[in-house]
């Protein structure tokens, strides 16, 4: 079997790229080790929650995907309040100030995945999907790439796109070097029902034990991410539901009153990943395979969707290109994405180091910085414009 492009990894970013190339003259294969998971019939909530920027929502809308998500499972954010760790410092951002109807949207991973896979499986057109398929070897040669599957099938391609996550097997096979360090933190995620209405406000607290974020869900519900050191994270995941709810409520200064746990807490390790290059001849990296950032800014998925948008525009613009794995063509993608990725890596890593420091002088100045920025509309406006764009 031969294709122009083979995407390895069918998560949100990989499936989005496949969908964005649907209907083009390109022949595309999407390979994923897992099988598509149908949405549950009950009203339960997914622990994996994404903050989707207006730009990402517009991109998904242009693909005909955003409109298909169940509107009752999408919550707009109208305001965001951020607090320092001295009990007084804070900064707030509002949609009204940004000139937009909302700052962002909150929705579940499984809602997005269901829409993406539905679009691919129900009307595949030029896309061939290999689900429950494991890649075991890749061999590069001058005229293309061979991918060997565990069942013995061989797939040929002009270009491989690695979209297989932060511990990318494709990246390793390509020999791309990585700057990779653990933050020695776990992101503890869970969903709660709340006593008080959230009024579509997102909250974030920079605390001495980490960063706690509240994202609004429909009705009186929130999703939380508590990025904290490993010992504390393990403790939080092993106490009773009642005690965990109490701890989160106290850490948030009871801003939404009493909390009741509605999904069991889960945890994921936090890592910084910077790749030496995004492309090689016949290879492109996108999403978490191309970058790994701290979740304190909630921008990981948006960074990946911007990868998808840039790459799909380049590939579709050159649909009659003689060789989609040509290094000169692929360098256009790297040039288009490098500055954005580097800036986001630098900002999120810097913020983590700044707010993770226990130095009393640094603590004083970071809290002062929050307060002063909140009092300077011009600077705050510039920060908002950069984040929203």
Describe each model-derived feature in a short phrase.
Residues 3-30:
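N-terminal Rossmann-like FAD-binding beta1-loop-alpha1 element of flavoenzymes
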Residues 13, 36, 167:
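Conserved Rossmann-like nucleotide-cofactor binding loop
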Residues 74-173, 181-186:
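Conserved N-terminal helical subregion
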């Amino acid at each position: 079997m031969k294709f122009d492009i083979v995407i390895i990894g069918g998560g949100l970013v990989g499936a989005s790229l496949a969908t964005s190339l649907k209907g083009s003259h390109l022949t595309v294969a999407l390979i994923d080790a897992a099988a598509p998971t149908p949405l549950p019939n009950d009203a339960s909530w997914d622990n994996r929650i994404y903050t989707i920027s207006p730009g990402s929502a517009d991109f998904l809308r242009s693909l005909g995907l955003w409109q298909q998500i169940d509107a009752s499972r999408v919550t707009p954010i109208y305001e965001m309040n951020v607090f320092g760790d001295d009990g007084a410092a804070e900064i707030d951002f509002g949609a009204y100030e940004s000139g937009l109807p909302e700052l962002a949207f909150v929705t579940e991973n499984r809602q997005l995945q269901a829409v993406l896979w539905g679009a691919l499986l129900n009307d595949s057109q030029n896309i061939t999907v290999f689900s429950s398929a494991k890649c075991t070897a890749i061999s590069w040669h001058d005229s293309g790439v061979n991918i060997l599957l565990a069942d013995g099938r061989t797939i040929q391609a002009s270009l491989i796109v690695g979209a297989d996550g932060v511990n990318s097997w494709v990246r390793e096979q390509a020999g791309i070097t990585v700057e990779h360090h653990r933050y020695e933190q776990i992101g503890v995620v869970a969903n709660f029902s709340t006593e008080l209405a959230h009024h579509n406000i997102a909250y974030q607290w920079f605390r001495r034990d980490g960063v706690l974020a509240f994202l609004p869900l429909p009705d009186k519900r929130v999703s939380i991410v508590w990025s904290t050191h490993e010992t504390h994270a393990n403790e939080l995941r092993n106490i009773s539901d009642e005690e965990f709810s109490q701890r989160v409520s106290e850490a948030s200064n009871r801003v939404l009153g009493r909390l009741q746990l509605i999904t069991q807490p889960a945890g994921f390790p936090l890592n910084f990943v910077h790749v030496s290059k995004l492309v090689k001849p016949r290879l492109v990296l996108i999403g978490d395979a191309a970058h790994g950032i701290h979740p304190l800014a909630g921008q990981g998925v948006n960074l990946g969707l911007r990868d998808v948008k840039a790459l799909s525009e380049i590939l579709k613009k050159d649909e009659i290109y003689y060789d989609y794995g040509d290094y000169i063509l692929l360098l256009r993608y790297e040039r288009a994405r490098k500055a954005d990725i580097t800036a986001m890596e630098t900002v999120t890593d810097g913020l983590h180091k700044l707010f993770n420091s226990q130095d009393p002088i640094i603590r004083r100045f970071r809290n002062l910085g929050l307060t002063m920025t909140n009092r300077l509309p011009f600077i705050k406006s510039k920060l908002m414009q950069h984040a929203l764009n």
